[in-house]
A protein has these predicted regions:
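Conserved C-terminal "switch" segment of AAA+ ATPases
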Residues: 69-78, 114-115, 223, 281-291, ...
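The Walker A (P-loop) glycine that initiates the GxxxxGKT/S ATP-binding motif of P-loop NTPases
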Residues: 163-165, 202, 233
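Hydrophobic alpha-helical topogenic segments used for membrane insertion/localization
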Residues: 6-23
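AAA+/P-loop NTPase substrate/partner-engagement loops
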Residues: 181-210, 218, 305
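Walker A/P-loop
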Residues: 157-191, 220
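Conserved catalytic/switch belt of AAA+ P-loop NTPases
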Residues: 231-269
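AAA+/SF3 P-loop NTPase mechanochemical coupling elements
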Residues: 222-230, 261-279, 327-331, 376-380
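Pre-Walker A (pre-P-loop) alpha-helix and adjacent loop at the N terminus of AAA/AAA+ ATPase modules
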Residues: 81-94, 101-113, 120-164
Length: 387
């Protein structure tokens, strides 16, 4: 049965190679094999603990290398052969074999894609920005310029984006919108929670509890080498409390020259990684890191902008989510002024979004408990609610 499967894999690999879907095709064959070979003996080293569509056993990884190893980057192909030898060897400890198999499983389930990017429809890109962001015309213009550059070169820009502004001004929302435009998977990294560079680079396999770092896990979660890496609170990157500065690790990721994880013991290509960082204070970011980004300053919203965002975006969004019609929760003009006045000393719109939640919840309570058909919030009612 194994020989028949190898033959199928070889045929599928040849057919799928032209379309760049080798690993997907092979994974599908393995899934089919598992479903119709109940009378076959299982591999002794089979340890399927996650998604059955992934290559996790030594035999499945060996078959993949036989059929489609040539589709891998050269250094990763050589690395895989070395680790396969370790995983199959009886001259090393069981711990070493386990680490080798785990590393192979992570690496083999990443699709190593070309760094050629198809043209992006500017009209569709602008539509997404308008859907996700209110105002911010200068910010949208900078993003559109980046999109046009990608369309001309078919590669990612040499510099990532750094969004600098007060908390709650929609920096993360902008980052997600860009990932959506690029049609790439995205992952987030919160630098305020990173105290030790090892959290990013992984730990050496000499330790029994060794594991890959957050960056390598991000590739694994995305399932491909092209992704948007959203780095939140970049200005906290230099405040490491452990053995070194986490900011130094970021430099290797931002240079697009490849990243080496201590656990994986292999340099992975990063030319398809597009970093988008957010920060509150640009002054707290080191010059070397700052030089790797195109900086976009995000201004705070004016009172008029906050009123529009609350009435057209924040409140309707909450009402829809909890099942209320707009006519059931009405905010008068002076009520809207009172809401904005209540939060005039806070930056961004996060507090306004929470105010919309509070308002809608109160309206729903009155409708369900007091059996009123609708609730209107004027300035007086707003002040009572938020005092």
């Amino acid at each position: 049965m194994r020989k028949r499967t190898i033959g199928i894999l070889l045929g599928m690999a040849v057919l799928a190679f032209a379309s760049g879907r080798v690993s997907t095709a092979i994974d599908s064959v393995y899934a089919a094999e598992e479903s119709d070979t109940s009378d076959d003996e299982e591999d002794e080293d089979e340890e399927e603990t996650g998604d059955e569509m992934k290559l996790t056993s030594i035999q499945s990884i060996t078959d993949f290398m036989t059929c489609a190893g040539r589709t891998l980057p050269d250094n990763i192909r050589l690395w895989a052969r070395r680790n396969l030898a370790v995983a199959r060897s009886h001259e090393v400890s069981p711990e070493e074999r386990r680490h080798a198999q785990r590393a192979l499983s992570i690496m083999m389930n990443i699709q190593w894609k070309s760094n050629y990017f198809e043209a992006i429809d500017p009209v569709e890109a602008r539509k997404i920005l308008d859907e996700e962001l209110y105002g911010m015309e200068k910010v949208k213009q900078r993003i559109m310029e980046t999109i046009i550059q990608i369309n001309r070169t078919h590669t990612l820009p040499a510099y990532g984006l750094l969004l600098v502004g007060p908390a709650g001004t929609g920096k993360s929302q902008i980052a997600y919108a860009v990932a959506r435009i690029l049609k790439l998977p995205w992952t987030t990294l919160d630098m305020s929670s990173i105290n030790d560079p090892e959290q990013l680079t992984g730990s050496s396999r000499i330790y029994a509890n060794a594991k890959p770092g957050i960056i390598m896990e991000a590739f694994s979660m995305a399932g491909e080498s092209n992704l948007v890496f959203i780095i939140n609170e970049l200005d906290k990157a230099a405040s490491g409390k452990g053995n070194g500065n986490p900011a130094d690790v970021l430099l290797t990721l931002l240079d697009n020259l490849g990243f080496t994880d201590n656990y994986m013991e292999c340099m992975v290509p990063t030319v398809g990684v597009y970093p988008i960082a957010t920060a509150n204070n640009k002054a707290d970011i080191s010059a070397p890191i700052l030089s790797r980004f195109a900086v976009i300053d995000i201004p705070d919203y004016t009172s008029e902008e906050k009123k529009i965002i609350f009435s057209r975006f924040a409140l309707p969004k909450v009402l829809k989510r909890i099942g209320l019609h707009q006519g059931e929760c009405v905010v008068t003009e002076d009520g809207l002024d009172a809401i904005v006045e209540q939060f005039k000393h806070t930056s961004g719109i996060r507090d306004l979004e929470q105010a919309a939640e509070h308002l809608a919840a109160n309206a729903l309570y009155q409708i369900e408990v007091d059996h009123v058909p609708s609730v209107t919030f004027d300035a007086e009612n707003v002040k009572k609610l938020f005092v």
